[in-house]
């Protein structure tokens, strides 16, 4: 596939965060860009204002004529789209050039040095942090991110001169096997997506295979203590990292007054007094990995210090919506038990003497079925849990799998309830809340503006 000869690109599942970065990339190249998504969102509306043509009905008559020329049209779809989708079927039956999002990402980044961040969790913040460090340094970078950077208001950064491309490497559907990393961080390998992989062993094997794709001359930066065994090619250097130990780690950690400072330690340097722009404890570990990537790519110590201090975070990743003396409200994308535990622990560290209320919308029936006890354990670290119905995404319901499974396994004595997401606002209006955390990867975050308004009126500080 020659990207240069393509005139039109059609996206099925245009509203996905990873898809939208590709949409912005092809718009920047002057291509005609159109597509379908199931529902309108703030992101799809933004893409329309940027030049994309997007519709929300599954209807081949709504596909623009420019996208019906199979010789000059590339069709991109996400694995979340059902195989029987009418538009996908039309393109298949008519012999169009059809690729998964991950395949296209692999093709367009193959000519650059890919700086990839893989792992069950932490990859969006770590990759966005690394992209910011490089973008504001003399090194520069292009970046395809899995979240909206608060520094830039987008999930795509472009550089005409830098050899580096920062990529969030997604293990879902083995998507990251299409990449050719120059360097890669692996943050975590807690089993997930067992609907795809079946077993923990298959999940870990997928990460092992991914490490074989790192190019000779490059590097693997592996979180210390992971179960997986890397299998890198000759000429690839393997480093370890974590918060407190490894080739890259933090020392002299200072947390207080809403600020975090660390010293970064590497085999060949030490950078003292780095301030975290988003001062939550999980970002110490994320920061160590991001700094390691930037350091190995040539960013100077001073550029790294300035970049870490000016990093503003990622939408829906420990995203403070409201903060005053009477109420704190934040949203976090955490949707795996290990992520939720880290998120709640980080909140607890910041607000030790306050009641922490978590609203959690489980994401996927299969994930809920596979991990409901682990979800209950992680959520039980809070003081109160409000569960909504499961967000299905690409899945059909599974008999007997509901939020009740998590509810029934929460620790004894915890305040808890289940409600429809439509009733969350009225429930919060009646409750006394001190610190509210909305967790999950579904659509509950769409209510964040209304929740913010309700709480700011109720607890005007």
Task: Give residue ranges: language-model regions.
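N-terminal leader/targeting and accessory segments in enzymes
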Residues: 1-100, 104, 219, 249, ...
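Nucleotide phosphate-binding/pyrophosphate-handling subdomain across enzymes
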Residues: 2-8, 18, 25, 29, ...
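Hydrophobic Val/Ile/Leu positions in short beta-strands of Rossmann-like dinucleotide-binding domains
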Residues: 11, 77, 117-119, 438
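Phosphate-binding loop of NTP-binding sites
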Residues: 25-31, 62-68, 79-222, 228-237, ...
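Short internal beta-strands
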Residues: 31-38, 220-224, 357-360, 382-392
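Beta-strand->loop->alpha-helix junctions that form or flank phosphate-binding loops
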Residues: 36-37, 55-60, 99-103, 144-146, ...
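C-terminal helical cap/extension that packs against the catalytic core
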Residues: 50, 376-434
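Short acidic/histidine-rich motifs immediately flanking catalytic phosphotransfer sites
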Residues: 68-74, 163, 432-434
């Amino acid at each position: 596939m020659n990207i240069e000869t393509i005139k039109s690109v059609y996206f099925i599942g245009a509203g996905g965060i990873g898809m939208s970065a590709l949409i912005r990339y092809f718009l920047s190249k002057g291509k005609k860009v159109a597509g379908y998504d199931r529902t309108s969102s703030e992101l799809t509306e933004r893409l329309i204002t940027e030049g994309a043509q997007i519709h929300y009905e599954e209807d081949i008559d709504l596909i623009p004529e420019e996208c019906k020329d199979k010789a000059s049209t590339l069709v991109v779809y996400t694995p979340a789209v059902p195989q029987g989708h009418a538009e996908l079927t039309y393109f298949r039956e008519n012999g169009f050039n059809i690729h998964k999002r991950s395949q296209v990402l692999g093709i367009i980044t193959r000519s650059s040095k890919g700086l990839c961040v893989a792992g069950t969790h932490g990859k969006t913040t770590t990759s966005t942090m690394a992209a910011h460090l490089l973008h504001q340094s003399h090194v520069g970078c292009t970046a395809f991110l899995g979240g909206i950077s608060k520094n830039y208001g987008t999930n795509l950064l472009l550089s005409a001169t830098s050899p580096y491309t920062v990529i969030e490497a997604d293990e879902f559907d083995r998507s990251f096997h299409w990449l050719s990393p120059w360097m890669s961080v692996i943050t975590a390998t807690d089993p997930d997506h067992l609907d795809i992989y079946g077993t923990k062993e298959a999940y870990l094997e997928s990460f092992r295979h991914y490490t074989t794709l790192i190019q000779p001359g490059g590097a693997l930066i592996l979180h210390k203590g992971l179960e997986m065994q890397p299998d890198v090619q000759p000429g690839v250097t393997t480093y370890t990292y974590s918060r407190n130990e490894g080739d890259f780690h933090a020392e002299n950690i200072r947390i207080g007054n809403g600020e975090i400072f660390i010293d970064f330690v590497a085999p060949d340097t030490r950078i003292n007094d780095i301030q975290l722009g988003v001062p939550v404890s999980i970002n110490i570990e994320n920061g160590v990995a991001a700094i390691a990537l930037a350091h190995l790519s040539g960013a100077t110590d001073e550029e790294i210090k300035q970049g870490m201090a000016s990093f503003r975070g990622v939408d829906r990743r420990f995203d403070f919506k409201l903060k005053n003396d009477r109420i704190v409200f934040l949203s976090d994308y955490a949707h795996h038990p290990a992520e939720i535990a880290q998120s709640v622990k980080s909140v607890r560290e910041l607000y030790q003497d306050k009641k922490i209320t978590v609203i959690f919308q489980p994401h996927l029936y299969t994930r809920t079925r596979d991990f409901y006890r682990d979800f209950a354990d992680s959520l039980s670290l809070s003081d109160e849990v409000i569960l909504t119905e499961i967000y299905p995404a690409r899945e059909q319901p599974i008999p007997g799998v509901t939020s009740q499974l998590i509810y029934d396994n929460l620790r004894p004595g915890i305040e808890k309830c289940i409600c429809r997401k439509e009733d969350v606002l009225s429930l919060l209006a009646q409750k006394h809340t001190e610190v509210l955390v909305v967790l999950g990867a579904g659509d509950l975050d769409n209510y964040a503006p209304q929740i913010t308004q309700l709480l700011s009126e109720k607890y005007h500080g």
